[in-house]
Amino acid sequence: NNLAYNNEITRTGKGGIIIIGGDTKTLTPGNSKADNNYIHDWSEIYQTYQPAVTLEGVGNICSHNEMENSPHEAITYKGNNHIIEYNLIHDVCLLSDDAGAIYSGRSWVWYGNVVRYNCIYNVGSENHGPDGIYLDDAVSGQKIYGNILVNIPSNSIHVGGGRDNVITNNIIVNPGNNALRFDDRSREG
């Protein structure tokens, strides 16, 4: 039950806001929120895996934030039942390839997360082609809808394995490689 609200965060050596809360065993929500923050020019020393907002645990929210000008990801989340909505994300992943402006990965059990109504544009740079929204290495049970993705150099939305992911009603303009990419890297054998 914590709130990071209406802050400007800039020139950090690492990331911006880290929210860890809730109980993954009982799925009790943390009810913490990063809302209406302006986060820019972060990760000046540690340039990867230091996002503007990190959500971990259960039932936390990242909403109405603007994030820009970073070498790597804007939002990373781990756990269940998080909501990521109404964020404006641009000019991120400027020095990264195997990444996403919004990223989660490597768990079959992180069901119930919702990524909706975000605007993501101008991701990557001339020499780097990351994804817009990247569900990596078997992350499952995600709902991705109502997002606007523009000028994403690799895959606008990339689902790297996993199951029970629902991708609907997104607007994708000028994708690089693919608007949507699904692969079976972690399919059941």
Where are these regions (language model features)?
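Right-handed parallel beta-helix
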Residues: 2-14, 28-43, 59-73, 80-94, ...
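Asp-box/WD-like beta-propeller blade repeats and closely related beta-sheet repeat scaffolds
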Residues: 21-24
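Acidic, glycine- and Ser/Thr-rich low-complexity intrinsically disordered tracts
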Residues: 182-189
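Structural detector of coil-to-beta-strand junctions
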Residues: 15-16, 50-52, 73-74, 99-101, ...
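Extended hydrophobic secondary-structure segments that form protein cores and membrane-embedded regions
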Residues: 34, 52-55, 103, 118
